[in-house]
């Protein structure tokens, strides 16, 4: 068991090892907040399993709204064409609703050539440990959670993304980017592209980040309340104007500012 409060990344590490060694399994569930990593490893899995140019014949997709056990069985029965494996991606289907018995029969007898991946994107993954299905997933599959990355790993990743643009960013500036824009990689990669296109020098500064990055609401609220204790009311008013320009609802703005002011009061 992972330490209390620490995310269990064992299935994530095992997935990376499987892809490196070429021993991809037959059954996976992908879920979690970090959509960038989920989509990245799904793409790596496709590249590892399916010959280039043959995806049309060996990659099968099924949306949750169209899911039927019969349809899944038909896809499972499709033999590979000029490939060792087929890959089936089922998106946003709640495994623990609907025909659980029929689904359990399929998952319990997957052919070796099939790699079946259930992807949770718009709906949360909530396992029901009491069901036979949960036992099958544990026995025959791998439930991979893509968690938000630790700050150290995220800083290294940000530095690599900037190096790909022939730019450099310091550790403290990378931390500031995370503070301002959040720690989800899809958001950060968009901001990195904007900053890279804007900055003229080879090394980024906080001024480059402030010039073009889109801040998250909480960061702007923190900047505003942080300007009040030293009496920098002009800056506080300027940041308040930025908050209004973000066109968030007044209730949400009050909630964020109230939270920051409570933290300021208790400090």
Where do the protein language model's features map onto the residues?
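Conserved beta/loop motifs at nucleotide-recognition and modification sites
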Residues: 1-267
């Amino acid at each position: 068991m992972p330490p209390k409060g620490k995310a269990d990344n064992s299935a994530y590490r095992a997935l990376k090892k499987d892809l490196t060694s070429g021993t991809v399994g037959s059954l996976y569930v992908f879920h979690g907040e970090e959509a960038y990593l989920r989509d990245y490893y799904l793409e790596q899995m496709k590249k590892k399993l399916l010959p280039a140019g043959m995806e049309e014949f060996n990659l099968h997709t099924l949306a949750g709204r169209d899911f039927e056990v019969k349809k899944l069985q038909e896809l499972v029965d499709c033999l590979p064409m000029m490939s060792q494996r087929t890959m089936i991606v089922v998106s946003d289907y709640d495994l623990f609703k609907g025909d659980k018995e029929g689904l359990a029969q399929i998952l319990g007898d997957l052919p070796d050539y099939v790699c079946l991946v259930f992807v949770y994107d718009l709906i949360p993954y909530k396992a029901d440990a009491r069901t036979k299905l949960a036992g099958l997933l544990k026995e025959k599959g791998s439930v991979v959670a893509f968690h938000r990355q630790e700050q150290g790993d995220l800083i290294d990743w940000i530095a690599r993304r900037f190096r790909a643009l022939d730019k450099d960013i310091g550790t403290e500036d990378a931390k500031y980017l995370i503070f301002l824009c959040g720690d989800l990689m899809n958001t950060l990669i968009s901001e990195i592209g904007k900053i890279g296109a804007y900055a003229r020098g080879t090394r980024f500064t906080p001024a480059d980040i402030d010039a073009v990055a889109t801040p998250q609401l909480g960061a702007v609220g923190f900047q505003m309340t942080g300007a009040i204790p030293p009496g920098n009311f002009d800056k506080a008013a300027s940041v308040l104007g930025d908050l209004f320009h973000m066109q968030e609802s007044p209730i949400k703005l009050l909630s964020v500012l109230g939270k920051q002011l409570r933290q300021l009061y208790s400090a």
